[in-house]
């Protein structure tokens, strides 16, 4: 670790940002979080973190924060994440996920904060033509959400050519589960995450789960996804930060386990775990959804000598359900 271990995090009161914050604090980093708390939750912020409640485009406030101490790197999580909503309100997603992020990062670069870890998405691949996707495969975003993420990826790539910017872009596959110590997890009134919604049904917070389409070209007709435990994803951020702080070159990495599960397979796994059957019904397809998207994450695994700790669907589901019970 560098002698100066100050790290700036946007969206640290959110699901993934809070998990990363807890882990970095455990490893001795000093964390400052910028979060507007519009979608974030103050209760998820580690008490050891310095929370600054403001918009990332509040130029005066952000500049004040950047001048208060020397930050080694910024981890950018802040943004909107609902694919279906982005199809209805594309301008909103481009504004929040690209325009606002660009304004914020420009302020960072002007203040010599030039190392960035960006929270991107596997949705930039669209409907891949192969079983497991590598980082150099064709990009074909199917939603404004994915478009907005790819736009910021391209902005970072362009900036790295012109100024002294180093980045790591992390393309998340489907993030699920909760902190094993139950310090943080996913809080959302309108979540569309399968495992979150299924856990709400399992804990009687919802009456039923809606499967959005069972006519896809997959073995059981439902979409296939690669689920990664949020604590493993947090560890990926830690390894990426350590890598970036050693002045290594910029990189793009997939974040997944390389194993796909259909929606019905996840439901069956949950039923076996609970020894019951959760209620579900078949609904229409959801705009912007991919059919099958599974990672090849060998690039990250080899670069970082990384091994997942929680690569087990049962464990992901157990922690998700435990978190829902805690929220009750």
Q: Which role does the model predict for each range below?
A:
Residues 109, 158-162, 191-195, 200-202:
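Basic phosphate/pyrophosphate-binding loop/patch that engages nucleotide-derived ligands
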